[in-house]
UniProtKB/Swiss-Prot annotation:
UniProt keyword annotations, A-Z: Aminoacyl-tRNA synthetase, ATP-binding, Cytoplasm, Ligase, Metal-binding, Nucleotide-binding, Protein biosynthesis, RNA-binding, tRNA-binding, Zinc
Protein purpose: Catalyzes the attachment of alanine to tRNA(Ala) in a two-step reaction: alanine is first activated by ATP to form Ala-AMP and then transferred to the acceptor end of tRNA(Ala). Also edits incorrectly charged Ser-tRNA(Ala) and Gly-tRNA(Ala) via its editing domain.
Record localization: Cytoplasm
Catalysed reactions, as listed in the record: tRNA(Ala) + L-alanine + ATP = L-alanyl-tRNA(Ala) + AMP + diphosphate
Residues annotated as binding Zn(2+): 564, 568, 665, 669
Protein's name in the database: Alanine--tRNA ligase
Organism: Paraburkholderia phymatum (strain DSM 17167 / CIP 108236 / LMG 21445 / STM815)
Length: 874
């Protein structure tokens, strides 16, 4: 049975049991800031388990794309060297949200495994949590599993609830006892049953974990019952496929074998058991699907994890002898294997291929640049007799140049040097602390709130007269009252304030009554349907239960709405002008501007920018109404509504028709396109490989920008004594004049260098038959210095020369050595001898080298020492 059939049978089985088939969520979690990547099927349902979100179904089944690389759940270093570790895997799961519990979950699992997949019952073992008598009795008395094949597992990890059979997604969140199902490969394979000293062997393989969600663990480790008992199960597709295909390694299943053969094809390797091929086959899945979900290789966060995975794959290609680009060519093979189950992969094939190809090409630049920095640091360390590379240097390589720490450590190891990793970790921690400090007010998520939801009125109203305070927080802790001057978060039962979401910033405004005034500087979501108003109490004492008038800053809201609506029109225009591949990759909409990141592989031309502006402003002039409808997600997408990157959508969505644009959006917008006033793009640039950024302004900001631009044009025209309409022609004339003068100046400098060279030649000192010259050439640039050195080498025949110039407090140095002398006297070493004394460094060829410095006061002494240095080399 092939992997695709196993996946389909799983989903169809649970659909027949009343479950709704739910599409896989993004690998970038939309509802959990504690997770780097989606690493299990339950991630998209976390808020449902917590009671913070409702769904129209109580039973669900999924085939969830998952990644474990980086953070707590990190399998990266094991991938390729074990039978079952992967960076990317598919988790088959069934879920109950307060519907069925342990009994049905266990019976469903047994029926699927033994009935649909026809696994022999005697091959299946199960484990339960030590204290879970209910699950034990269901397995033993109802399913009929013999007692010797049911194993109780207690707290075997050194703490209460720290057990292989007590599951938790992270340090906080939903958790509960679990029951695991194992497959016995038989006595010919070494290993013991779970809980035994030999459990790490390959005989007994876990294939399914049934988690019975009963608790929510908070940051202090406290367990509170979930509002409803729930079921979360997970079965790795790769593991069950290995069992059903009668192989002992996941890499031997049909899906992986196709990718391994493709990797072998691109690397010209015949041995399909080579571990490096397994690494490449695994990594193409993780990298491709991460890019599908909007992750781009970068130097931090998810982008850095992706970059590490890509480079690890390429590094293994090098080990196999492949020196050129190859990794991106495997995308087509992956699409052939998985594009049917995940059409989003097929749709993004061209983009994924391009991003991976660019990252491969940049790999060489990154490694070369990073190596040059590391070599310089190691040379400096060697000159001081040190054996430990400063962790700050390693951190700079990591943070600025995207240089993996493990690669730095490998290079150092070859030189007998270690990396000060504690110092590296300190630098990383310092950076994180700075990031936390910068986001002082961004503390809404994570507040311990269990009260009523907030009803949002902001689409229709800018004022709500009778809002009741349901919770108050100071420094993240719940309080009953706030006094004057305190910063706090206020939760209301009703609000017109829009909470930051979908790229749109939160509202600002005031909460007030006769004795209270609270200034709101930001609005963020505490939970999916709970709004936190962040700010400072300016007057009175605010208590839980108080009733206030909630009023937003209407002018700021209107400006933000103009920019948000313009973003929709711009997105549509970009797709028309640049192509349908344009997808939103991020946005920031505030009162001043809209910043829009999108997938595109080249800078926009001036003509393309003008065309986008023309299209958007035509829609503005059309003054079309904005029409909002609420409908099912699938219906909206089928109707042409655009779903955006990074957004988490429920089963019912808000669809906005605005002019020629139709998008899913929960933000605030203008009533008619004419309310935007004027649209103007003010910036276009690149932010990452394959990602462009546009900034635009609207309304009075756009009018002001155009007026200021017109004033600058008139001022420039006046300075050049021309009319504004003649400005381009006049600038061209001035540029031609400047070029002619620069050419004339260059000729004069060359002539001066020639005459100075003749004069300098007489200053050379004979040292053992070599003419040594070290001098300053006033007013010379680097080009003039180099030309003069070349002429002096020709004139002096056998020579070692250093020429210097000083301009703006900076020293320029050129060293030249004739061919007959360069075996003993190297130009690079000579120029470095001088450069080190003037606060710089340099390098170059044995016959010609260049350097710079920042301490011109030391230059005379440095040049005076050249004769002795050359003498020592001869």
């Amino acid at each position: 049975m092939k992997a695709a059939e196993i996946r389909e049978k799983f989903l169809k089985f649970f659909e027949s049991k009343g479950h709704t088939i739910v599409r896989s969520s993004s690998l970038v979690p939309g509802n959990d800031p504690t997770l780097l990547f989606t690493n299990s099927g339950m991630v998209q349902f976390k808020d449902v388990f917590l009671g913070a979100e409702s769904r129209p179904y109580s039973r669900a089944t999924t085939a969830q794309r998952s990644v474990r690389a980086g953070g707590k759940h990190n399998d990266l270093e094991n991938v390729g060297y074990t039978a079952r570790h992967h960076t990317f895997f598919e988790m088959l799961g069934n879920f109950s949200f307060g519907d069925y519990f342990k009994r049905d979950a266990i019976h469903y699992a047994w029926e699927l495994l033994t009935g649909v997949y026809q696994l022999p019952k005697e091959k299946l073992w199960v484990t339960v949590y030590q204290e879970d008598d209910e699950a034990y009795d269901i397995w033993a008395k109802e399913v009929g599993v013999p007692a010797e094949r049911i194993i109780r597992i207690g707290d075997n990890k050194g703490a209460r609830y720290a057990s292989d059979n007590f599951w938790q997604m992270a340090d906080t969140g939903p958790c509960g006892p679990c029951s695991e199902i194992f497959y016995d490969h038989g006595p010919d394979v070494w290993g013991g049953p779970p809980g035994s000293p030999e459990e790490d062997g390959d005989r007994y393989i876990e294939i399914w974990n049934l988690v019975f969600m009963q608790f929510n663990r908070d940051a202090q480790g406290n367990m509170t019952p979930l509002p409803k008992q729930c079921v979360d199960t997970g079965m790795g597709l790769e593991r069950i496929a290995a069992v059903l295909q009668h192989v002992h390694s996941n890499y031997e299943i049909d899906l992986f074998q196709a990718l391994i053969k493709a990797a072998a094809r691109e690397t010209n390797i015949d041995d399909l058991s080579n571990n490096s091929l397994k690494v490449v086959a695994d990594h193409i899945r993780a990298c491709s699907f991460l890019i599908v979900d909007g992750v781009i290789p970068g130097n931090e966060g998810r982008g850095y994890v992706l970059r590490r995975i890509v480079r690890r794959a390429i590094r293994h290609g090098y080990k196999l002898g492949r020196k050129g680009s190859f990794f991106h060519k495997l995308v087509a093979d992956l699409v052939a294997q998985m594009g049917g189950a995940y059409p989003e992969l097929k749709d993004a094939e061209q983009r994924v291929t391009h991003v991976l190809r660019q990252e491969e090409e940049r790999f060489f630049e990154t490694i070369e640049h990073g190596m040059s920095i590391l070599e310089g640091a190691l040379a400096d360390l060697d000159s001081k007799g040190g054996k430990t590379l400063d962790g700050e240097v390693a951190f700079k390589l990591h943070d600025t140049y995207g240089f993996p720490l493990d690669l730095t450590a490998d290079v150092c190891r070859e030189r007998g040097v270690t990396v000060d990793e504690p110092a590296f970790d300190e630098a990383m921690a310092r950076q994180r602390e700075q990031a936390r400090a910068a986001g002082k007010f961004k503390m809404a998520q994570g507040l311990d709130y269990t009260g009523a939801k907030t009803t949002f009125h902001g689409y229709e109203e800018i004022v709500f007269d009778d809002a009741r305070v349901t919770a108050l927080y100071v420094d993240g802790a719940s309080v009953n009252e706030v006094t004057k001057g305190q910063q706090a978060v206020v939760v209301l039962d009703h609000t017109p304030f829009y909470a930051e979401s979908g790229g749109q910033v939160g509202d600002q405004g005031v909460l007030a009554n006769a004795s209270i005034r609270f200034g709101v500087v930001d609005t963020l979501k505490v939970q999916a349907d709970v709004v936190g108003h962040h700010g400072t109490l300016e007057q009175g004492t605010l208590k839980v239960g108080d009733v206030v008038k909630a009023e937003i800053d209407a002018v700021r809201r209107a400006r933000t709405a103009r920019n948000h609506s313009a973003t929709h029109l711009m997105h549509k225009a970009l797709r028309e002008v640049l192509g349908g591949h344009v997808q939103q990759k991020g946005s920031l909409v505030d009162a001043d501007k809209t910043r829009f990141d999108f997938a595109h592989n080249a800078p926009m031309t001036d003509e393309q920018i003008r065309r986008v502006e023309e299209i958007v402003n035509a829609e503005v002039l059309a003054n079309a109404p904005g029409i909002v409808r609420v409908m099912a997600y699938d219906e909206a997408v089928k109707g042409g509504a655009m779903a955006l990157f990074g957004e988490k959508y429920g089963d019912e969505v808000r669809v906005l028709d605005l002019g020629f644009s139709r998008e899913l959006c929960g933000g605030t917008h203008v009533n008619r396109t004419g309310d935007i006033g004027l649209f103007k793009i003010v910036m276009e640039g690149g932010v990452a490989a394959g990602i462009r950024r546009v900034e635009a302004i609207t309304g009075d900001n756009a009018v002001r920008f155009v007026q200021e631009l017109d004033a600058r044009i008139h001022a420039a025209a006046a300075a050049l004594k021309a009319q504004p309409s003649e400005l381009t022609q006049r600038i061209s004339m001035v540029q031609d004049q400047v070029k002619a003068l620069e050419k004339e100046l260059g000729a004069l400098k060359s002539k001066l260098a020639s005459s100075q060279g003749d004069e300098l030649a007489s200053q050379a000192i004979d040292v053992s038959g070599v003419q040594v010259l070290a001098a300053t050439l006033e007013g010379a640039d680097v080009k003039t210095l180099r030309e003069t050195v070349d002429k002096l080498k020709d004139k002096l025949k056998s020579a070692a020369i250093v020429l210097a110039s000083v301009e703006g407090g900076k020293v320029s140095l050129i060293a030249g050595v004739t061919a007959d002398t360069s075996k003993k006297v190297k130009a690079g070493e000579l120029v470095n001898f001088v450069a080190q004394q003037v606060g710089g460094k340099g390098g170059g060829r044995p016959d010609m080298a260049q350097a710079g410095g920042t301490e011109p006061a030391n230059l005379p002494a440095a040049l005076a020492g050249v004769k002795g240095w050359v003498e020592a080399q001869l």
